[in-house]
Structure formats: C-alpha cells, structure tokens
Amino acid sequence: MKEILITNDDGFEAKGLHELADALRQIPDVNVTIVAPSSEKSACAHSLTLTKPLRFIKIDDNFFKLDDATPSDCVYLALHALYQKKPDLVISGINHGANLGEDITYSGTCGAAMEGVLQGIKSIAFSQFYKNNSIEELGFSLACQIVKFIVPRVLEGEICLPQRQFLNVNIPAVAARDFKGYKVAPAGRRCYATHATLNRNPRGVEYYWLGNAALDYEEGQISDISVINDGFASLTPIQLDMTAHASLENLKKSFQ
C-alpha cells in the first residue's frame, strides 16, 4: 500500500483538494491522508509559522485541517506528528489557478511540494489554469484525468524525480475533449505589473489590493506558459538548488 499525503493553499474546503483526493483513491493500493490549511493561504510561498502554536482539527478519518497554518506547515507537521513512517509521495493541489513561471516563487501550492522535497519525499504540485473560465464552468475532470495518469508513473518510478526536485504540473483551461497531451517545458518568465492601485474606503482611508493586475509573459520561448496556452499540460521539474553556478567563478575572481 502506497501512502500519499495531500495538501493545498486554497483551504480544506476547496473543491480542487477534494477532487484530487477522490482521483487518487481510484488508483489501486493507495491510501490518502489530507492535511490542509483551515483557510485560504494563496501566495504564502514556502513560509512556516514560527510565532504561534498550531493544532490539528480532525474532520474525518485521514482528514485534518491545521488551524491558521500554511501549506508548508501542513506538510512539516503531518510528517513529524501524524506519520510514524514517511509517506511515499506528497501532492499539493489541485490549485484553483495556474502556477507558471515566477508564480512558483510566490505559490503556497509549490511551497508545500518544496517542503516535501526538503523532507526527502517525492513531491508533485498540480494547478488548474483558468483563462476566462470559472471553476464551476471548467471543473476538474481533466485535472483528475491527468492526476491519474501521472501519479502511478511517479510511484512506480517510470517518471523519475531526483532528490531535491519536485514536479510542477499545470493543467490547461480546456475541456477534456480538447486536451492536446503533455509537454515537458522549462518555467517561463512572467511580466509583472509595476504599479499599485490606490483605493479609499467610505471614510477616505487609503488602502491597496495586491494581485489584481493582469499578468503577461515573455513571448518567443517555449515554456510552461506557452505550452499551457497551446492546450497542453506542462510538466516542469523544479530544483531547490538556488545557487547561480554559472556566476560562481566570475564572483570568485572579484575577490581574488
């Protein structure tokens, strides 16, 4: 029996989380445990909660929410407080929205997969891209189809995940009948907004909202972003080695 721990950054009630769990339970000889944040934690990246205690709240058998925790908290505490033996796989998702290019650095979904990798466990992040679609309109049927294709191959070693790397999977905003297949691609480059929108409440107090600007991407390169826009699922191996190795020698020369 293979043990899979799943979490997300949309919260324990999110439809994508429950669709993921249902899809995984259709894979033979798999046991699924859910540990998810008690509320939405989008864009919390790979943060841990170090300034207050955390507690598990049992929802059902093998289903817990972690009170006011981040996705990385969920993975860390589940591994050290719930499991006596490490699970075979950590899966984060299915996120309500894509995690493409530099989104990965902000993503709580990807942060949870990073934590799994740091704990020595194979990890995958699944995210559903939306263009002009709503969650209700597009649903998760294609995403679940992709989960059931990829996960057994990871568990069986057909898809190799080296140490300190996780697999980032983004699902295109198309119906299953229009799905074009799978493409392995590098993470692209997002073009982020360079302005902030000022608002005022009825009393005239100023405030700002983050994340409400449309994002573009650098064209002319094959990337996870272009692949998704073409109707393919993107598969991107993400490594945790953040050293810019190509710059090491030049930097050393500056200090000789």
UniProtKB/Swiss-Prot annotation:
Keywords tagged on the record: Cytoplasm, Hydrolase, Metal-binding, Nucleotide-binding
Catalytic activity: a ribonucleoside 5'-phosphate + H2O = a ribonucleoside + phosphate
Entry's localization field: Cytoplasm
EC numbers: 3.1.3.5
Cofactor(s), by name: a divalent metal cation
Binding residues annotated for a divalent metal cation, in chain numbering: 9-10, 42, 95
A Pfam family: SurE
Gene Ontology molecular function terms on file: 3'-nucleotidase activity; 5'-nucleotidase activity; exopolyphosphatase activity; metal ion binding; nucleotide binding
One term under GO cellular component: cytoplasm
Cofactor note as given: Binds 1 divalent metal cation per subunit.
Family of the protein in this entry: Belongs to the SurE nucleotidase family.
NCBIfam families: PRK00346.1-4, PRK00346.2-4, surE
PANTHER family: 5'-NUCLEOTIDASE SURE, 5'_3'-NUCLEOTIDASE SURE
Role description: Nucleotidase that shows phosphatase activity on nucleoside 5'-monophosphates.
The name this protein goes by in its record: 5'-nucleotidase SurE
UniProt organism field: Campylobacter curvus (strain 525.92)
Gene, per the UniProt record: surE
